[in-house]
Regions:
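Acidic/His- and Gly-rich active-site-bordering loop/insert found
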Residues: 2-112, 133-138, 349, 359
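Acidic/histidine-rich catalytic neighborhood of metal-dependent amide-processing enzymes
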Residues: 117-191
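Glycine/serine-rich anion-binding loops at beta->alpha junctions
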Residues: 107-123, 202
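Acidic-glycine-rich active-site phosphate/pyrophosphate-binding loop
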Residues: 89-105, 168-169, 184-195, 321
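Metal-dependent amide/peptide-bond hydrolase catalytic core
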Residues: 2-5, 12, 29, 54, ...
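Phosphate-handling active-site elements
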Residues: 105-107, 127-143, 223-233, 373, ...
Length: 391
């Protein structure tokens, strides 16, 4: 494997990574408040005043940011995408270091969002700064998109899609943590809420009631059996269906009249969410016919498709070649969680990869942390990819 040792790329240092990443982590952008507008301003302060950018406001405190490096043509180009929000910190007392102090110990920076995914944001900023310093006009435009609300409903990337600024790009790099590999696929998410209305009775006379808790459990069990026995993806494995919330019951001696279950179904490419919904409706339909008086409602809470980019696409071939040059593994990786790709790729239908610093297994964890060398390595990946294919 060729190691990166070209002096042209030596200007990106771990010290630069540390300085930028500390500034990002020290801004609290935890859900549900977000406060990404403040972080967008901090990012702009790191860059020259004459850059081309658009700030898309979602509320008084929440915003997304698009920075554009104009190309020789307006058609095509590439977009780097990273989100600015993070999940909540949880119990602060469980952290070894305050989650927004961005403490560095050796090569490791600790803090909420360090891996997911302000490390990726820092790598994007370093690549952007390098791009601006070259003072060269790329063949096609290059976009750096910093989004809000990825950890919830995705209002940031949806706002960017609605704005249309990046909708003509040829390819997208999602800068989420990919564990020193290149991701070419991600699971979809299909969340269902199933509510059963039965009939209340004394628990000593279950024959006079309709036990909503028991029937919601039976419905979910039948659905899981159908969903989890489908096709196997070579990287992502199988579709999974997990009951993540179950509510019902009044007292021990009362047959429960209502019950509610929420399912988090993670699908692999090729599995139709419409088909899963149809299966759910069919099971519910059988229950309605067999149990006189039972009522069942099904609500779709989240619907994001599974995505995959062909290994034969130019983007995958080129990014793998570039990864090898900077010491990143060319092993295929799949992501079990969804990213901003789930809300932009279906709209513009272009190839994408997931390639960013850090270990995705540390996302959302207590004592979340990232290697500064990993941030530097991915900054150089973006830099070298742009130098090779866009300058």
């Amino acid at each position: 494997m060729k190691k990166e040792n070209d002096n042209k790329y030596a200007q990106i240092t771990t010290e630069q990574c540390k300085q930028i990443l500390q500034k990002l982590v020290q801004i609290n952008t935890c859900q549900p408040e977000g406060n990404e507008g403040k972080l967008a301003d901090v990012i702009l302060e790191m860059l020259p005043e004459n850059i081309v950018y658009k700030k898309i406001n979602h509320s008084k405190t929440r915003a997304s940011l698009i920075i554009k490096v104009n190309g020789e043509t307006e058609e095509g180009g590439i977009a780097f995408v990273g989100h600015m929000d993070t999940v909540a910190c949880g119990d602060y007392s469980q952290w070894s270091y305050p989650p927004h102090d961005a403490i560095v110990k050796g090569d490791i920076l600790y803090g909420r969002g360090s891996a997911d995914m302000k490390g990726g944001d820092a790598a994007m900023i370093l690549a952007l700064k390098w791009m601006l310093e070259t003072k060269k006009r790329p063949k096609k435009s290059i976009y750096f998109c910093f989004t809000a609300d990825e950890e919830s409903k995705g209002s940031g990337i949806c706002g960017i899609v609605k704005d249309g600024t990046v909708n003509k790009v040829d390819e997208i790099i999602i800068c989420e943590p990919s564990d020193e590999k290149i991701g070419t696929c991600e699971k979809g998410a299909f969340w269902l809420k199933i509510t059963v209305q039965g009939k209340q009775s004394h628990a000593s006379r279950p024959d006079l009631g309709i036990n909503a808790v028991e029937y919601v459990e039976k419905l979910v069990a039948q659905l899981k059996e159908q969903v989890e026995t489908g096709e196997v993806h070579p990287i992502l494995g199988t579709t999974t269906a997990s009951v993540t919330k179950l509510c019902g019951g009044i007292m021990t001696n009362i047959i429960p009249p209502t019950a509610e279950a929420e399912l988090d179904i993670r699908t692999v490419p090729g599995v139709s969410h419409e088909h899963i919904l149809k299966c759910t409706e069919e099971i519910a339909g059988r229950f309605r016919k067999e149990i006189l008086g039972i009522q069942i409602t099904i609500e779709v809470m989240n619907d994001r498709p599974a995505l995959e980019t062909s290994k034969d696409s130019p983007l995958v071939k080129q990014i793998m070649k570039t990864a090898q040059m900077v010491g990143i593994s060319t092993e295929d990786k799949g992501h079990y969680f969804y990213t901003d790709a789930s809300q932009i790729i279906p709209e513009i239908s272009v190839p994408f990869v997931i390639a960013g610093p850090g270990d995705d297994a540390l996302a959302h964890c207590i004592n979340e942390h990232i290697s500064l060398e990993s941030v530097r390595r991915y900054a150089k990946l973006y830099q070298k990819y742009l130098e090779k294919y866009y300058l």
